Amino acid sequence: MASPAMVPLRQLFVDGEWRPPAQGRRLPVVNPTTEAHIGEIPAGTAEDVDAAVAAARAALKRNRGRDWARAPGAVRAKYLRAIAAKVIERKPELAKLEALDCGKPYDEAAWDMDDVAGCFEYFADQAEALDKRQNSPVSLPMETFKCHLRREPIGVVGLITPWNYPLLMATWKIAPALAAGCTAVLKPSELASVTCLELADICKEVGLPSGVLNIVTGLGPDAGAPLSAHPDVDKVAFTGSFETGKKIMASAAPMVKPVTLELGGKSPIVVFDDVDIDKAVEWTLFGCFWTNGQICSATSRLLIHTKIAKKFNERMVAWAKNIKVSDPLEEGCRLGPVVSEGQYEKIKKFISNAKSQGATILTGGVRPAHLEKGFFIEPTIITDITTSMEIWREEVFGPVLCVKEFSTEDEAIELANDTQYGLAGAVISGDRERCQRLSEEIDAGCIWVNCSQPCFCQAPWGGNKRSGFGRELGEGGIDNYLSVKQVTEYISDEPWGWYQSPSKL
């Protein structure tokens, strides 16, 4: 029997060097496809976070900031572009590691690596553009003053990222933070840290100055919590669950520390009766089953017009049964395992609860018959939903789509907004004006028209309501990591003249 593919053995990345964790502990890496242990990651703790934050602070202040924080954006851009080039050079290796680590189909993981490189390139451009934005003048009503603005890095930032897009979600935070001149400590999810540690290797290879990016892997309570509460961290950016987001806000509050939160979702996709059914079916399934259904923005609540519901559901079942569920490294895989046994059991519980509450499982909901091991769940479509059901209200984070019918546009809007979340939404219709109306009516940070899930680093990303606040990516993405300073100068030769001058002796 062939031995399992193993992941590289790495340490923590602190101050430009590999360091063993202070307490010497390590966590197993489990391949969700085979359930086999394929390596280990270091289990960092508060001592390691302290060292990483100290390294980041030293890098920020080195040479009074001239080496990084106050260096021209063009200097930082060179490093970001070098990282992007190395990611592309190592794309096959990185994509395979991500497939092994979190179960993502290889083709998706390879696409993610292109996006990782593209994001570093984009924020390299933004770093250079920042040079041109410096000292921008402000028009004032008094000619005796002139004013300009400086945009300065906010400082040391703590970045806490999830396991569904391990390297890409980390890049969404690292690239703009470094472009802005910040230094950073990254704490990736303990369920998928492998490619983030390989990013550290890339940073070392391209000569990124020591301490600019530090990576501490480990459990949330042991490493993430000390990072978010650290008094020498100036900002925290987090992507993950609503419950963890609340804890991060609470830990930041005593220091009035800014946070950016991208949390959960239960996003709607609204399909009207004027669509090409097969095109709409494919986008509907892609919107929910992409990345094995583990997407914050998954459009996992399908609202389908009553007139076409029966035919649409039949075609969805046919398409879903045609999705290749397999080892992520198999050619043509379109659905791999969910990331861990814990997630697997949680998703199965959601499905069984829905069934016990009266919902109908149209297809899926079980392990594929041909896969004896691994955390696999067939693409699942559930109907006969009521709006009080758990499956309608709670984020499943797996390949589970729930379906509800509507008759009027107003009803569709009401159902679409019947959620505590507001990350994304989609509408599919041949009526452009109707699509425009719904894009305005749905309460979410991102709306897709006649598609679902496309995401580009050139456009802002973030949610409303319990999906968090702040926007990443886009031209404003770098501003998350900048502090604006106004510099106002009195330019008149005349004295100010507010106080009466004392008599000269």
Curated annotation (Swiss-Prot):
<feature type="active site" description="Nucleophile">
    <location>
        <position position="296"/>
    </location>
</feature>
<comment type="pathway">
    <text>Amine and polyamine biosynthesis; betaine biosynthesis via choline pathway; betaine from betaine aldehyde: step 1/1.</text>
</comment>
<comment type="function">
    <text>Dehydrogenase that catalyzes the oxidation of several aminoaldehydes. Catalyzes the oxidation of betaine aldehyde to glycine betaine. Catalyzes the oxidation of 4-(trimethylamino)butanal to 4-trimethylammoniobutanoate.</text>
</comment>
<dbReference type="GO" id="GO:0042803">
    <property type="term" value="F:protein homodimerization activity"/>
</dbReference>
<keyword id="KW-0560">Oxidoreductase</keyword>
<dbReference type="InterPro" id="IPR016162">
    <property type="entry name" value="Ald_DH_N"/>
</dbReference>
<dbReference type="GO" id="GO:0019285">
    <property type="term" value="P:glycine betaine biosynthetic process from choline"/>
</dbReference>
<dbReference type="InterPro" id="IPR016160">
    <property type="entry name" value="Ald_DH_CS_CYS"/>
</dbReference>
<keyword id="KW-0547">Nucleotide-binding</keyword>
<dbReference type="GO" id="GO:0047107">
    <property type="term" value="F:gamma-guanidinobutyraldehyde dehydrogenase (NAD+) activity"/>
</dbReference>
<feature type="binding site">
    <location>
        <position position="262"/>
    </location>
    <ligand>
        <name>NAD(+)</name>
    </ligand>
</feature>
<feature type="site" description="Transition state stabilizer">
    <location>
        <position position="164"/>
    </location>
</feature>
<dbReference type="InterPro" id="IPR016161">
    <property type="entry name" value="Ald_DH/histidinol_DH"/>
</dbReference>
<dbReference type="Pfam" id="PF00171">
    <property type="entry name" value="Aldedh"/>
</dbReference>
<dbReference type="GO" id="GO:0031402">
    <property type="term" value="F:sodium ion binding"/>
</dbReference>
<dbReference type="GO" id="GO:0019145">
    <property type="term" value="F:aminobutyraldehyde dehydrogenase (NAD+) activity"/>
</dbReference>
<feature type="binding site">
    <location>
        <position position="395"/>
    </location>
    <ligand>
        <name>NAD(+)</name>
    </ligand>
</feature>
<feature type="active site" description="Proton acceptor">
    <location>
        <position position="262"/>
    </location>
</feature>
<dbReference type="InterPro" id="IPR029510">
    <property type="entry name" value="Ald_DH_CS_GLU"/>
</dbReference>
<feature type="binding site">
    <location>
        <position position="191"/>
    </location>
    <ligand>
        <name>Na(+)</name>
    </ligand>
</feature>
<dbReference type="InterPro" id="IPR015590">
    <property type="entry name" value="Aldehyde_DH_dom"/>
</dbReference>
<dbReference type="GO" id="GO:0008802">
    <property type="term" value="F:betaine-aldehyde dehydrogenase (NAD+) activity"/>
</dbReference>
<protein>
    <recommendedName>
        <fullName>Aminoaldehyde dehydrogenase 1a</fullName>
        <ecNumber>1.2.1.-</ecNumber>
        <ecNumber>1.2.1.47</ecNumber>
        <ecNumber>1.2.1.19</ecNumber>
        <ecNumber>1.2.1.8</ecNumber>
        <ecNumber>1.2.1.54</ecNumber>
    </recommendedName>
</protein>
<feature type="binding site">
    <location>
        <position position="461"/>
    </location>
    <ligand>
        <name>NAD(+)</name>
    </ligand>
</feature>
<feature type="binding site">
    <location>
        <begin position="241"/>
        <end position="244"/>
    </location>
    <ligand>
        <name>NAD(+)</name>
    </ligand>
</feature>
<comment type="function">
    <text>Dehydrogenase that catalyzes the oxidation of several aminoaldehydes. Metabolizes and detoxifies aldehyde products of polyamine degradation to non-toxic amino acids. Catalyzes the oxidation of 4-aminobutanal and 3-aminopropanal to 4-aminobutanoate and beta-alanine, respectively. Catalyzes the oxidation of 4-(trimethylamino)butanal and 4-guanidinobutanal to 4-trimethylammoniobutanoate and 4-guanidinobutanoate, respectively. Catalyzes the oxidation of betaine aldehyde to glycine betaine.</text>
</comment>
<dbReference type="GO" id="GO:0000166">
    <property type="term" value="F:nucleotide binding"/>
</dbReference>
<comment type="similarity">
    <text>Belongs to the aldehyde dehydrogenase family.</text>
</comment>
<dbReference type="InterPro" id="IPR016163">
    <property type="entry name" value="Ald_DH_C"/>
</dbReference>
<keyword id="KW-0520">NAD</keyword>
<dbReference type="GO" id="GO:0047105">
    <property type="term" value="F:4-trimethylammoniobutyraldehyde dehydrogenase activity"/>
</dbReference>
<comment type="subunit">
    <text>Forms homodimers.</text>
</comment>
<keyword id="KW-0915">Sodium</keyword>
<dbReference type="GO" id="GO:0110095">
    <property type="term" value="P:cellular detoxification of aldehyde"/>
</dbReference>
<feature type="binding site">
    <location>
        <begin position="161"/>
        <end position="163"/>
    </location>
    <ligand>
        <name>NAD(+)</name>
    </ligand>
</feature>
<feature type="binding site">
    <location>
        <position position="101"/>
    </location>
    <ligand>
        <name>Na(+)</name>
    </ligand>
</feature>
<feature type="binding site">
    <location>
        <begin position="187"/>
        <end position="190"/>
    </location>
    <ligand>
        <name>NAD(+)</name>
    </ligand>
</feature>
<keyword id="KW-0479">Metal-binding</keyword>
